[in-house]
């Protein structure tokens, strides 16, 4: 086990004391109060882990001191206790090391969820609908709020494309590993020979960006208004409430028509645009880290097949970590999705520990 520098831990404890004192004094303005409260919430967990680690270290030192005593019975007792105490110390150290890993600044953010039907025609669109329902149920279980921002329905149901906002604390941390190509294997209802068809849909999860995260110059935008359209292209209202925003420098285009209010559609379109620009900027800045992540757990690039949902066998396989669950219905219901997410988070943490020389 690699020792954790004591001075680093002391610095964290000192910062915890400073933040606690500042908040207790009641002198922080509203913006600083919110930021410090969030910092204290994060620090509380780390401080608890530091104290647990140091208590385990102290207990191990006590056992090792007993091994040096002259009393044979005490030495025998210490020798018997040492493996268990050592294991507890190592577990506390591992938990603390994970706490000290570099944090993704976007982890606490809400997210923009984009699902697009891939190969497979109508069946792919139906599968895109299945994925949206899975994430909606998962969001409900987590106490998050999910709202569709824009949608392009499939001819037989489901979606050719659907974009949704998922709001809540820590949404991106849980959903970011869902980005990639999801494959489904099942017998379509229209298949008379009982043959299994393979279809796919792509998922992109972007951290929601606020105006302070990314500045969008109005001069760089081309904004078009039009009447909202329903299935088949017919107009569904008489006012030009639909909004299409083109970000000229990047070529990113966002179209939103879900609300009857042009103002609300514009606000939602800008939220999606900021998220896409923010993700583009993050990708450029974090290229080295992304390369390391690709080597460890898969990039989550949309071109990469990350997961297969096999209906005849009732299984879900995540190819990045070679994990198979025979819980297809539970995963699609959102109730077993955490089993996949937790495994992906654990693998990602192991990769980061190795990169930090702590694994």
From Swiss-Prot:
Give this protein's Gene Ontology molecular function annotations. Answer: translation release factor activity, codon specific
Q: Which residues form a coiled coil?
A: none
What Pfam families does the record point to?
Answer: PCRF (PF03462), RF-1 (PF00472)
**Residue ranges, annotated region (Disordered):** 283-305
Keywords recorded for this protein, A-Z: Cytoplasm, Methylation, Protein biosynthesis
InterPro entries linked to this entry:
PCRF, Pep_chain_release_fac_I, Pep_chain_release_fac_I_sf, Prokaryotic/Mito_RF, RF-1
Q: Where in the cell is it found?
A: Cytoplasm
Q: How does it get modified after it is made? A: Methylated by PrmC. Methylation increases the termination efficiency of RF1.
On this chain, the residues bearing N5-methylglutamine are 234
Q: Which GO terms describe its cellular component?
A: cytoplasm
| Name of protein | Peptide chain release factor 1
- Name the family the entry cites: Belongs to the prokaryotic/mitochondrial release factor family.
Gene name of the encoded protein = prfA
| Purpose | Peptide chain release factor 1 directs the termination of translation in response to the peptide chain termination codons UAG and UAA.
Name the source organism: Methylobacterium sp. (strain 4-46)
Q: What is its main location?
A: cytoplasm
């Amino acid at each position: 086990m690699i020792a954790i520098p004591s001075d680093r831990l002391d610095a964290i404890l000192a910062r915890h004391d400073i933040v606690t004192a500042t908040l207790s004094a009641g002198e922080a303005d509203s913006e600083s109060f919110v930021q410090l409260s969030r910092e204290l919430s994060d620090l509380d967990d780390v401080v608890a882990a530091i104290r647990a680690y140091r208590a385990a270290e102290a207990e191990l030192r006590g056992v090792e001191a007993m091994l040096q005593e002259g009393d044979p019975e005490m030495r025998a007792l210490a020798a018997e206790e040492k493996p268990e105490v050592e294991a507890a110390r190592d577990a506390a150290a591992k938990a603390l090391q994970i706490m000290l890993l570099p944090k993704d600044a976007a982890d606490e953010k809400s997210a923009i969820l984009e699902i697009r039907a891939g190969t497979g025609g109508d069946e792919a669109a139906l599968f895109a609908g299945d994925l949206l329902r899975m994430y909606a149920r998962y969001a409900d279980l987590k106490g998050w709020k999910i709202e569709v921002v824009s949608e392009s329905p499939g001819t037989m149901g489901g979606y050719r494309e659907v974009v949704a906002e998922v709001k809540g604390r820590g949404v991106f941390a849980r959903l970011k590993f869902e980005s990639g190509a999801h494959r489904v294997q099942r017998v379509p209802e229209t298949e008379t020979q009982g043959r299994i068809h393979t279809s796919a849909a792509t998922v992109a999860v972007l951290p929601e960006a606020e105006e302070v995260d990314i500045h969008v110059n109005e001069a760089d935008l081309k904004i078009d208004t039009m009447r909202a359209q329903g299935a088949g292209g017919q107009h569904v209202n008489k006012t030009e409430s639909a909004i299409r925003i083109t970000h000229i420098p990047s070529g990113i285009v966002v179209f939103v028509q879900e609300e009857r209010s042009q103002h609300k559609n514009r606000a939602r379109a800008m939220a999606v645009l900021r998220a896409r620009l923010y993700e583009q900027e993050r990708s450029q800045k974090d290229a080295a880290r992304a390369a390391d992540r690709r080597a460890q757990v898969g990039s989550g690039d949309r071109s990469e097949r990350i997961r297969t949902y096999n209906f005849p066998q009732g299984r879900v396989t995540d190819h990045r970590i070679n994990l198979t669950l025979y819980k297809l219905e539970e995963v699609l219901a959102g109730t077993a999705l955490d089993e996949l997410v937790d495994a992906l988070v654990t693998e990602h943490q192991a990769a980061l520990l190795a990169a930090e020389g702590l694994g």
